[in-house]
Amino acid sequence: MCSSDLTAQQLAEHFAARGVAVNYPGLASSPYHEVAKKQFGNRYGAMLTLRLGTKGKAFDFINHLHYALNVSNIGDARTLVLHPATTIFVHASEEEKAAAGVTDDLVRINVGLEDPEDLLEDFQQALQQI
C-alpha cells in the first residue's frame, strides 16, 4: 500500500474504535469490504467519510483541524476535508443527496502524504473538540 492508503486505513480504524460512523472499504465492518478486497486487493484508497451526528459538529470538526485543508477538490499531496452537503452537493435536491448518501453530518476526508502520527493527533484533537 502507498502511504496515503495506509494512513486512511489507520484513520478509519481510529475513528471506528471511538464509535464514529466511518465509511471506508478497508474496514472489515464495511458492507463493501469483500467486494473491494476482490477488486482492489489490499489497496482500499485514500478517501473515507465520517458521520458526526449534526451539521454543526461536522463544521466544528473541520474548523478545528490544523493539517487538513478545507477544500473541495481531490488529488492533492495534502490531506483535504470537506462538507459535501454544502460544497459539491449544494445544488442537489434533498432526494439527490439522499440517493448519494450525502447527509448534513457527513465529512469527506482525502488523505494526503503527511506523517500518519501527525494526522492521527490532529484528527483526534478535532474530534475531542466537538
Which residues does each predicted region cover?
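PLP-dependent enzyme catalytic core of the Aspartate aminotransferase-like
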Residues: N63, T79-I130
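Short, small-residue-biased leader/transition segments that mark boundaries at the very start
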Residues: M1-S3
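Conserved small-domain helix->loop->beta segment predominantly found in fold-type I
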Residues: D5-S72, D76, S93-A98
